[in-house]
């Protein structure tokens, strides 16, 4: 089985930027957010179920999912959020495992924004946390998403805390520094993960 490194971090921490740096070095990326979008594409059973549950108000004019409208519907309703999670999480897990099985590179970088919140730590051999302070998170989120400060703070309030993420980390990337510093951190971790993956493969071969 391919060695799995889970990459996580709060909103605005720069997970995609870090993943892009790993991809430049030849690392295979499996992104939970991309898979989550794929399972609700038009024509997929999950989107039909969502439409039946919430009505046409959560669809765009072209029939695709209006993610913003859906977020508004479930944000203040734990029951509806749980229903949606029960629908989507098994589908996301199934597709994730299918992608894992199809990959033959030494290790996979599995990008999972809600790794800690969903208790998925045990599904990876290594956990990498992208870390920035709260002020930086808010500044980046406001600049990127065009939302209000209150909306950004509401998102942070329902995510794992910085301390909770760091407590799960095997490795930490400080993404508050310059791009060159980030590239250097990624290159060092990439070499380390190749070594860990090789060691894990050797142990598995000896046990067969």
From Swiss-Prot:
> So where does ATP get bound?
12-17
Query: What is the annotated localization of this protein?
Result: Cytoplasm
By its UniProt entry, which NCBIfam families does this protein fall under? dephospho-CoA kinase
Per the UniProt entry, the Enzyme Commission number(s) are 2.7.1.24
- Which reaction(s) does its UniProt entry say it catalyses? 3'-dephospho-CoA + ATP = ADP + CoA + H(+)
Can you say what this protein is called?
Dephospho-CoA kinase
Q: What does this protein do?
A: Catalyzes the phosphorylation of the 3'-hydroxyl group of dephosphocoenzyme A to form coenzyme A.
GO CC annotation, single: cytoplasm
> What keywords appear on the UniProt entry?
ATP-binding, Coenzyme A biosynthesis, Cytoplasm, Kinase, Nucleotide-binding, Transferase
Instruction: Supply the InterPro entries for this chain.
Output: Depp_CoAkinase, P-loop_NTPase
Origin superkingdom: Bacteria
* GO function term, MF aspect, one: dephospho-CoA kinase activity
Q: Name any Gene Ontology BP term.
A: coenzyme A biosynthetic process
Which Pfam family, an example, fits this chain?
CoaE
Q: Where is the DPCK domain?
A: 4-200
- Family named by the database record: Belongs to the CoaE family.
The protein's matches in CDD domains, at most eight in alphabetical order, are given as: DPCK
Please name the Gene3D superfamilies in this protein's record.
P-loop containing nucleotide triphosphate hydrolases (3.40.50.300)
Pathway annotation: Cofactor biosynthesis; coenzyme A biosynthesis; CoA from (R)-pantothenate: step 5/5
Coiled-coil region? none
Record's keyword annotation contains Methyltransferase: no
């Amino acid at each position: 089985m391919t060695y799995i490194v889970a990459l996580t971090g709060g909103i605005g921490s720069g997970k995609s930027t870090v993943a892009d740096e790993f991809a430049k070095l030849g690392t295979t990326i499996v992104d939970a957010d991309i898979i989550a979008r794929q399972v609700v594409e038009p024509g997929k059973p999950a989107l039909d179920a969502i439409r039946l549950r919430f009505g046409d108000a959560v669809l765009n004019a072209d029939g695709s999912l209006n993610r913003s409208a859906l977020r508004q519907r479930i944000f203040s309703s734990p029951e509806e959020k749980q229903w949606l999670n029960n629908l989507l999480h098994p589908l996301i897990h199934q597709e994730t495992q299918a992608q894992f099985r199809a990959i033959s590179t030494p290790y996979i970088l599995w990008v999972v924004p809600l790794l800690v919140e969903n208790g998925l730590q045990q599904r990876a051999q290594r956990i990498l946390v992208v870390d920035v302070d709260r002020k930086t998170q808010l500044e980046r989120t406001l600049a990127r998403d065009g939302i209000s400060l209150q909306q950004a703070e509401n998102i942070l309030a329902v995510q794992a805390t910085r301390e909770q993420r760091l407590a799960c980390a095997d490795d930490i990337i400080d993404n508050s520094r310059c791009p060159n510093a980030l590239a250097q951190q990624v290159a060092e971790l990439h070499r380390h993960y190749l070594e860990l993956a090789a060691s894990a493969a050797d142990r598995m071969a000896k046990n067969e």
